[in-house]
Regions:
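Catalytic domains that recognize anionic headgroups
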Residues: 1-181
């Protein structure tokens, strides 16, 4: 089951059940036409329950394509109540912001991703008595925040700075999964 909160899967998920969550309407998880990443956890049990039984019996792989820390609109990726690094850059025109504002806005997205991952792990923990569960988190790219006058990401790998190439990898295993040989 592919859940997408970014710009769609661009055909990658065409052969599997998929849901685009970024355009949903939810009073606390969406604002101004965009949804925050925890929307992917909303109604997740029902989405899995709607899969064919034969497919569920084999096990379910969930792919959650986050909006995460994608710029330049870092300020839109985090609900106001979760913003702890201020002042933050509140425009898409990154050159109009100080380095401190830009880093604060980006750091808010990282902290909110931590919150989202904690929620995802909590969801998995609730199911670990009946299922062996695992979470693997990996980012698709790093991000430049003005170092050497570079912003965002997307340079060819051969010339991209390390901050665009080095990404986090986080793994969480349920007790049952960890005990497997």
């Amino acid at each position: 089951l592919w859940l997408d909160n970014q710009a769609g899967c661009k055909g990658t998920c065409a052969r599997v059940p998929n849901v685009e969550t970024g355009n949903l309407k939810h009073p606390t998880l969406c604002s101004a036409g965009e949804c925050w990443d925890p929307i992917m956890l909303d109604s997740l049990d029902a989405r899995i329950g709607a899969l064919p039984a034969a497919q569920r019996d084999k096990g379910v792989l969930l792919v959650m394509h986050q909006m995460g820390s994608h710029g330049p609109a870092y300020h839109k990726r985090v609900p106001q109540a979760f913003k702890r690094f201020m002042p933050e850059c509140s425009t898409n025109n990154l050159q109009d912001c100080s380095r401190e504002q830009l880093v604060n806005a980006y750091d808010n997205t990282i902290a909110y991703t931590d919150h989202f991952l904690a929620q995802a792990i909590g969801w998995l923990q609730q199911r670990q008595t009946s299922h062996d569960t695992v979470m693997v988190y990996v980012s698709d790219h790093g991000e430049s925040l003005g170092e050497n006058n570079l912003y965002l990401h997307g340079l060819p790998y051969a010339i991209a700075p390390d901050v665009q190439k080095h990404v986090p990898w986080i793994t969480w295993l349920s007790h049952g999964f960890a005990q497997r040989q």
